[in-house]
Amino acid sequence: MTTTIFFATDIHGSDICWNKFLNAGKFYGADQLILGGDMTGKAVVPFIHQGGPNYRVTLLEQVFEITNEDELTEMKKKVRSRGYYPYLTNPDEIKELEKDPEKVSAIFSQEVLKVVQQWMEIAEKKLAGTGMKVYCCPGNDDMDEVDDVIRESRTVVLAEGEVVDLPSGHEMIASGWSNRTPWNTHREEDEDQLAARYEAMISRLKNPQASIFN
């Protein structure tokens, strides 16, 4: 029996990429979906209230003046399609945030996890009745708290550090950890630690020759 697996990685918070990934299973006749890592985006984009229905948004160094609800909705979609997180705020809060990096970090985490939760719900709706599951291991850019959200899903399986038995009969090991980077990301470690991480998973495989190393 032939098994088709669709693999993608590094979607970095983009709603468009997540939805295309979920749709790819049916389009390509895949039996299972694997997302390799780096699910989440890298920045919050402030939507600064200017009074009434008006907001000012700076996206990729371009300033947009929003003047009505339809424009606001479209700009949110545009920001999300690029993997950033829209955050409605006001000039007073912006002044406070400029002096409080911890609060900025908290807002970023809040928005990231909110979107990951939305993605889990989208996956459950799109893949209901298909028999397909998503096997996912967050990457080095993804905060640890992402794992907790994925664990609650009935459709998206957290594969990090596990030996997963796929419906095809193959075993799969998976990890989103990387070697050291200049950016001190969430999941990185020295080469010998990475080797130990993979050796621990490999030692649990029944048939390494027919296994998937993700």
Residue ranges with predicted function:
Residues 1-5, 163-174, 206-212:
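Beta-strand-turn-beta hairpins that frame and shape the catalytic cleft
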Residues 29, 103, 116, 127-130, ...:
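His/acidic metal-ligating clusters that form di-metal
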Residues 138, 174-176:
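Short, structured patches in soluble enzyme cores that scaffold and shape functional sites
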Residues 15-167:
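Core catalytic region of metal-dependent phosphoesterases/phosphodiesterases
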Residues 5-9, 135-136:
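Short catalytic-loop micro-motif centered on adjacent basic/acidic residues
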Residues 8-13, 110-115, 187-190:
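Short, flexible loop segments at the rims of nucleotide/cofactor-binding pockets, characterized by
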Residues 5-7, 33-35, 213:
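Residue-level marker for buried hydrophobic side chains located in beta-strands
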Residues 146-149, 182-187:
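A short secondary-structure junction signal
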